Curated annotation (Swiss-Prot):
InterPro entries: DnaJ_domain, DnaJ_domain_CS, DnaJ_subfamily_B/C, DUF1977_DnaJ-like, J_dom_sf. One of its GO terms (cellular component) is nuclear membrane. It comes from Pongo abelii (Sumatran orangutan). Residues 69-84 have a biased composition (Polar residues). Residues 55-93, 219-241 are annotated as: Disordered. One of its GO terms (biological process) is cellular response to misfolded protein. One of its GO terms (molecular function) is Hsp70 protein binding. SMART domains: DnaJ. This is DnaJ homolog subfamily B member 14. It holds the Pfam family DUF1977. Acts as a co-chaperone with HSPA8/Hsc70; required to promote protein folding and trafficking, prevent aggregation of client proteins, and promote unfolded proteins to endoplasmic reticulum-associated degradation (ERAD) pathway. Acts by determining HSPA8/Hsc70's ATPase and polypeptide-binding activities. Can also act independently of HSPA8/Hsc70: together with DNAJB12, acts as a chaperone that promotes maturation of potassium channels KCND2 and KCNH2 by stabilizing nascent channel subunits and assembling them into tetramers. SUPFAM superfamilies: Chaperone J-domain (SSF46565). It is a single-pass membrane protein. The gene is DNAJB14. Residues 266-379 are lumenal.
Length: 379
């Protein structure tokens, strides 16, 4: 099957050369041959363009080389304002078509995002934001834009996950990386499967959702009575191997099982926390109190005042304030990130309504953090 893929790619290259030479019939013939050999998205997209718009002569698109690459032998995609009609009669430009073909031609996740192999989180986020806005199906109606958008999302989902990225780099199988076949299965190692759909990933970046850690009121295990939980999506990987696969899965799950057992044992060995930042009827922590220093409200049970006095009470109130400040700091970070992303999207789309919405965000947690900071300095 992979031999057919190579032959199909050669046919697509011949078709592009024919288009550049103005030979529409030859290009169409080789694209149809490529379709029979292997279902390449680039061949299908080019064939649709020929059938709808005739010859698309010009420089053939190619993957964006990562920064630092010395290869300058390939021509850049030409700018062209020629427009066509996509699905549902919506228009698209030749630039958009070239961009879609460029993405679909990329052979690994790094080429899809246009980053180097040592790119950090910020580089990946910057590259994803730029490409996701450019190729989102609501904005780009060129043939194959949806597949390109999915490919971008899958590439980011893999490279932004340290474990998947490590597994992806170790295989060395970049030729087939991040290409999704028509039968709905990836044709390479399972480490390149995304745990989140491209649309959900887009909503996280531009819809206000942030999968960051959230501080909950107290799990014990240290003197401060606070614990931060990091929520992560977990994907269900497809079973591809038989035989001793069950034993391999068991070995892989052993660290997780050990962690769960240790966590359960630690919970059994730790006493209930003496306070909560929110009323909790289940533990009887419904009596409202306030710290002496910052005036932070917290809730205790009916026996608290008898058990905690003097220095013990001061230690508890110090823990209350530390947990409260941590909570406010995390929420302030989320507010700032949301505002930054909205401003970026408004700039890209030139959307005044979105810009006004970003400017109108109340930033309540950030204001509270400033108030607490001034109290600390004043104290």
């Amino acid at each position: 099957m992979e031999g057919n893929r190579d032959e199909a790619e050669k046919c697509v290259e011949i078709a592009r050369e024919a288009l550049n030479a103005g030979n529409r019939e030859k290009a169409q013939r080789f694209l149809q041959k490529a379709e029979k050999l292997y279902p390449l998205p680039s061949a299908r997209a080019l064939l649709e363009i020929i059938m709808k718009n005739g010859s698309t002569a010009g420089n053939s698109p190619h993957c964006r080389k990562p920064s630092g690459s010395g290869d300058q032998s390939k021509p850049n995609c030409t700018k062209d304002s020629t427009s066509g009609s996509g699905e549902g009669g919506k228009g698209y430009t030749k630039d958009q078509v070239d961009g879609v073909l460029s993405i679909n031609k990329c052979k690994n996740c790094y080429e899809v995002l246009g980053v180097t192999k040592d790119a950090g989180d910020e580089d990946l986020k910057k590259a994803y934001r730029k490409l996701a806005l450019k190729f989102h199906p609501d904005k780009n109606h060129a043939p194959g834009a949806t597949d390109a958008f999915k490919k971008i999302g899958n590439a980011y989902a893999v490279l932004s996950n340290p474990e998947k990225r490590k597994q992806y780099d170790l295989t060395g199988n970049e030729e087939q990386a991040c290409n999704h076949q028509n039968n709905g299965r990836f044709n390479f190692h399972r480490g390149c499967e995304a745990d989140i759909t491209p649309e959900d990933l887009f909503n996280i970046f531009f819809g206000g959702g942030f999968p960051s850690g959230s501080v909950h009121s107290f799990s014990n295990g240290r003197a401060g009575y606070s614990q931060q939980h990091q929520h992560r999506h977990s994907g269900h990987e497809r079973e591809e191997e038989r035989g001793d696969g069950g034993f391999s899965v068991f070995i892989q799950l052993m660290p997780i099982i050990v962690l769960i057992l240790v966590s359960l044992l630690s919970q059994l060995m730790v006493s209930n926390p003496p306070y909560s930042l929110y009323p909790r009827s289940g533990t009887g922590q419904t009596i409202k109190m306030q710290t002496e220093n910052l005036g932070v409200v917290y809730y205790v049970n009916k026996d608290f005042k008898n058990e905690y006095k003097g220095m013990l009470l001061q230690k508890v109130e110090k823990s209350v304030e530390e947990d409260y400040v941590t909570n406010i700091r995390n929420n302030c970070w989320k507010e700032r990130q949301q505002k930054t992303d909205m401003q970026y999207a408004a700039k890209v789309y030139r959307d005044d309504r979105l810009r006004r919405k970003a400017d109108a965000l109340s930033m309540d947690n950030c204001k509270e953090l400033e108030r607490l900071t001034s109290l600390y300095k004043g104290g």
